[in-house]
Amino acid sequence: MAIFLIIFVVFFGFCILSTPLFRWIDIVYNKKNLPPGTMGWPIFGETREFLNQGPNFMKNQRARYGNFFKSHILGCPTVVSMDAGLNVYILNNEAKGLIPGYPQSMLDILGKCNIAAVHGATHKYIRGALLSLINPTMIKDHILPKIDKFMRSHLSGWDNCNVIDIQQMTKEMAFFSSLDQIGGFATSSSIAQEFRAGFLNIALGTISLPINFPTTNYYRGLQGRKTIVKLLRKIIEDRRGSKKIQQDMLGLMMNEEAKNRYTLSDEELIDQIITIMYSGFETVSTTSMMAVKYLHDHPKALEEIRKEHFAIREKKSLEDPIDYNDFKAMRFTRAVIYETLRLATIVNGVLRKTTQDMELNGYMIPKGWRIYVYTRELNYDPLIYPDPYTFNPWRWLENNLDHQSSFLMFGGGTRLCPGKELGVAEISTFLHYFVTRYRWEEVGGNKLMKFPRVEALNGLWIKVSAY
């Protein structure tokens, strides 16, 4: 009885204390010309509802308040924009009172110098350094041959498998391919395995609350970063002691430094390498997995993509690699990739932070607030994509959708993803060898979670056989 009395007193006391706090929040956040919306609980805001309900939370708020509303998520007062025209304006006007506004956990784990965190002249400089590594000429002459060689070798290991978890396999494929491009590290090498252990913790920690306690994903992410930083510092130190220039991303980036074209500090260099690994891993692995699923579920699309890739193979001997001209000819494959990105919504949106009070859409957004350019709902807008919940790669061939202002799957403005073509090349090469090499059928584990990241909760198991 005493325990129930204590619980009642604590709960009643909390309600009494919370009431003035909620009233204070309403007064603070409604005294200015802010967009409509709710701010939720003190300190925590509406983060729990946002993470638990995901897209439904956004749909409900949109139904109540329209395409532009306020909230308090991931520790910050935030304005959410689902207006296509306004989203383009926000992404194209970063210099006018806006800077990147990604969560603190992401900044802490990927590094304060990563390209997504910096702005102004520093961003322009680092973007130039990255584009010198992954521009179309570099993809054609250096990167695509490495990707092709890796994919051939990596997928050959699947030949003796009967049933595989394609989610796990594409994660390994994306990670080790990225590591091969960055440092030329073989999949079976001990250093690759050390990178893998640290990196998996990084991937978990980036979308977590910044609570630095041993049982949290944020803590694990920080520990993973320490592991990766230590490994990279040792590699950079060893390479500086050698006169040989390695023909991988790290080597070429260090060579640019030697030629005084782009001089990055060790911290900047390390943060870019971690960011390249992270960006490529999440997008390439998940898009590859979901493309395999969608192609399985839509036989006509599978038939069409096979037709495209067998036409390429007919012009080659068995051991000939695909080249840049082959890659550019993969029109339907690119359409499959774009449609997969759209329908699965691998990327939900981008964040900006105001550096001054600014007016948007007739409302005043205070300095220090986040603006969440939420693109997910645009992916299912029937005015842009007729029959939006249907997997239809042909829509990308019939209409120039990737040039429309609503196409924000790779970001926009000065922050259009510099690795866009690299990612498409990697997924295209994987699909080339996968669809020409295997037949497959799903055998279980097809329960998908699509927020906050796309994931098959029990794996996505498929039975593979030679084509």
UniProtKB/Swiss-Prot annotation:
InterPro entries (UniProt xref): Cyt_P450, Cyt_P450_CS, Cyt_P450_E_grp-I, Cyt_P450_sf
BP terms from Gene Ontology: brassinosteroid biosynthetic process; brassinosteroid homeostasis
Cellular localization per UniProt: Membrane
Topology in the lipid bilayer: Single-pass membrane protein
Molecular functions (GO terms): brassinolide synthase activity; heme binding; iron ion binding; monooxygenase activity
Binding locations of heme: 417
Protein purpose: Catalyzes the C6-oxidation step in brassinosteroids biosynthesis. Converts 6-deoxocastasterone (6-deoxoCS) to castasterone (CS), and castasterone (CS) to brassinolide (BL).
Protein name: Cytochrome P450 85A3
Organism of provenance: Solanum lycopersicum (Tomato)
Designated gene of the protein: CYP85A3
